[in-house]
Amino acid sequence: MKFVSFNINGLRARPHQLEAIVEKHQPDVIGLQETKVHDEMFPLEEVAKLGYNVFYHGQKGHYGVALLTKATPISVRRGFPDDGEEAQRRIIMAEIPSPLGNITVINGYFPQGESRDHPLKFPAKAQFYQNLQNYLETELKCDNPVLIMGDMNISPTDLDIGIGEENRKRWLRTGKCSFLPEEREWMSRLLKWGLVDTFRQANPQTMDKFSWFDYRSKGFVDNRGLRIDLLLASAPLAERCAETGIDYDIRSMEKPSDHAPVWATFRV
């Protein structure tokens, strides 16, 4: 089974990239983040014609996530159990049947956080990671097939930082988000629960592959970016991971998202 995660940075602005992903990868499951479209305005017909069951959880102008599945899910959940009406639309989950049993897929657009001293955004990022941790610990078991994918807005290791050493030090010094010690600790807790970073498992030393590139500084041209889009798998999936990758070809299309799609294939 093949899973693709893509921060599309506006679904209605980039249908050409979604179509290209489907044509090239033929994924079983696609997780989209930052769809930026209210549920009532979601282009359901246009997306469904690509051959998928389509589930979405969005709001006007910001955030928003969607799951596209070949197989009909057993169940779909939008948001965390305790989310109120005011909660940002950032997470969607599904139980997807497979020969391995039902796979719990969690697709998230994790808060960016901005910087350590931001009074709202940084605590919101911490809370989101805590909510996910709580969900894993209370609702799921790590010996079952679980896949968390999405724009997680954290570079797990220094190998995932490609913005230059001076910028790396400056970001740490000024408290800018993406690889602060606190953020690394949140990520570490997820991994300790029983998840594996599929890309890093397959590429333990790779230090020149990234998934986000800044528009303004034309980071993609120079391969200056961060690997912040991840597929984290529990052991039953991780040990069956056949291939992973980051699709630079899709990122190099006309009018692209600032993110590249990331993907993993599992032998199930």
UniProtKB/Swiss-Prot annotation:
Cofactor: Mg(2+); Mn(2+)
Residue numbers marked as site, Important for catalytic activity: D229
GO biological process: DNA repair
E.C. number(s) listed in UniProt: 3.1.11.2
Magnesium as UniProt keyword: yes
Cofactor stoichiometry and binding remark: Probably binds two magnesium or manganese ions per subunit.
Domain of life: Bacteria
Keyword terms, alphabetized: DNA damage, DNA repair, Exonuclease, Hydrolase, Magnesium, Metal-binding, Nuclease
Site annotation Transition state stabilizer: residues: N153
InterPro entries assigned to the protein according to its UniProt record, in alphabetical order: AP_endonuc_1, AP_endonuclease_F1_BS, AP_endonuclease_F1_CS, Endo/exonu/phosph_ase_sf, Endo/exonuclease/phosphatase, ExoIII-like
Binding site for Mg(2+) 2: D151, N153
MF terms (GO), sorted A to Z: DNA binding; double-stranded DNA 3'-5' DNA exonuclease activity; endonuclease activity; metal ion binding
Residues with site note (Interaction with DNA substrate): H259
Pfam family for this entry, one: Exo_endo_phos
Amino acids binding Mg(2+) 1: E34, D258
PROSITE patterns in the record: AP_NUCLEASE_F1_1 (PS00726), AP_NUCLEASE_F1_2 (PS00727), AP_NUCLEASE_F1_3 (PS00728), AP_NUCLEASE_F1_4 (PS51435)
UniProt subunit comment: Monomer.
Family: Belongs to the DNA repair enzymes AP/ExoA family.
Its biological purpose: Major apurinic-apyrimidinic endonuclease of E.coli. It removes the damaged DNA at cytosines and guanines by cleaving on the 3'-side of the AP site by a beta-elimination reaction. It exhibits 3'-5'-exonuclease, 3'-phosphomonoesterase, 3'-repair diesterase and ribonuclease H activities.
Protein name: Exodeoxyribonuclease III
